[in-house]
Amino acid sequence: YDKYVVLLSNLQKLQNERNNLSKNIGIKKSSGEDASEEIKAVSELKTSINSLQDDSNSLEENIKTILEVIPNMPSDDTPEGKDEASNKVIKVHGDITSFSFSPLSHDKLGFNLGMMDFDKASEMSGARFVILKDKLALLERALSNFMLNIHTQKHGYTEISPPSLVRDSALFGTGQLPKFSDDLFQTTSGHWLIPTSEVPLTNIASNEIINKDLLPFRFTSLTSCFRSEAGSAGQDTKGMIRLHEFKKVELVSIVKPNDSSGEHERMLQCAEEILKQLELPYRVVILCTGDLGFSAAKTYDIEVWLPSQNKYREISSCSNCNAFQSKRMKARMRSSENNIESVHTLNGSGVAVGRALLAILENYQNKDGSIDIPTVLKPYMNNMDKIKLNE
C-alpha cells in the first residue's frame, strides 16, 4: 500500500508537470515561438506517465484482491475468542423437553411415519437431500406461512419473492464471493444459486442512493437455499440438519447507521417470537470474534433444543454488518444536508424452516410415534391435532 501511495504521488507530479508544459506549448505557439523542447519533454513524460500508470493499476488490483478477502471488523461488544467454545450464552428460554420414554431422532420419526424419504432423494439427487411427504410436507408449508404472516403482519416486514439465481456482483456485495465460492453452486451460464435470500434481499439496495427518510427498509422472504457444504464432510450426515437444499424465511434490514444497533436487537426479538409461539425451548448466544461470519460485525445465534442430540442446535443467526456490505455493493443514503454515506445492513433467519420442522418432530413426539401439532400451527394444518403413525 505504501508503494502504491508513493506511485500515485509521483504520477500526480508528472501529470502536473505535463499539464504545465502543455500550457507553455500553447502560449509559445500562439506567439510564434519555438516549442520543440517542450514538445519533446511532454513526449518523454507521456512514456513515464504510462509506465507509472501501469504499475499503479497493477498495485491497485493487488490491493483490491487482498481487501476482498479481509473480513469485517468485530464490534466492540463482540466477545474475544478463537472458536465457538468462547461464544457466550446470554439467554435461555423455556424448559428442556422431558419424556417418559427414550425420544427418537427426527429422521427416525419421519421414516416411521412414512413421510420422510432420504433414500429416494439420494437416488435422484445424491446425499444431503430429503423428500417430505403428506403431512410433513404440509407441516413445512404451514411453518413457512406462519413465519411469513408473523413477520409481515406483526413485525412490519415487506414480503419479497426474489430470484434464486444471482450474478457474481450480488454475492460479492454480501461477502460470499470471492472467498467462499467452494460452498456455492454455480450454473454453466455463470449464475449462482443463492445460499441464503440475504443475498437478493440486501442487493435490492445495491448501487442506490436512498433518501434517508425512506429508511428503514425491512424485507422478508421464503426461498430455497443451496449450499455445497464443502467444509462439512462427515458432519451431520444423517437427517435434515445439514442439507444441500433447504427452505428458510429470511429477514433483512437496511437502516441509517445510527439505527443499526437497535435494529439488531429488534431483529433478534422478531426471530425469537417464532420459537416462543411454537413453544420450543431455545437459547441465545453471542458469537465470539473467532466464530463470526465474514461480513458480520456482531452476531446472535438462536439455538433450539434437540432431545435426540441432548443439546441446542442453531436455528437462526442474526447479524449486524454495519457498512461492510453496503460499501461493497455501493448502497448509500442521502442525508438532509445532502451528504451521501453508506447505509447499514442486517440479516437474520426468521427462521430456518427445516430445522423448525425437525425441532417440532423431536420436541412434540409421543411414545406411539405420533407428533402433536403446536397450537399456533393448527389453523395452517386443517385444525388437526396430531400427525399419526400410518395415518
Task: Give residue spans per PLM region.
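N-terminal alpha-helical targeting/anchoring segments
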Residues: 1-97, 115
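TRNA-recognition modules of translation machinery and tRNA-sensing kinases, especially anticodon-binding
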Residues: 92-391
